[in-house]
Amino acid sequence: MNHHKIVRVRDVMNPDFDIVDGAMTVKDALMSMKHPENKCFIVEKRHEDDEFGLLLVSDVARKVLADDRAANRVNVYEIMQKPIIYVDPGMNIRYCARLLERFEITRTPVIENNEVVGIVSFTELVMGGMRDRWEGA
């Protein structure tokens, strides 16, 4: 029987992320980005009954750059994804990887008590969850 310590999303997630207002222009969002390694922005809720959104850098490439649209004339809400799939920080990384794979997404917010606490991607799951465990063995 395999008795490995269960690695949780909270153990590998990136707690640093960029959060933007959906009414911002894409240009303003890109200019404000402090964590480009995440390749995404969390879009704030507008009110209590709203949901978080997600804007990937690849969305900007496809829906602004490739379509030859002006980034200073496109608002984040026009091209963001909403509603989004998110995970709990207590989730086992194996299930998180399966969820990302099943829905063909590469990264997702980590939400606890209705607040974003981090971002997790396949990179964090593999490098932080698998590789680091092998190094500690």
Predicted region positions:
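Tandem CBS (Cystathionine beta-synthase) repeat/Bateman regulatory domains
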Residues: 1-137
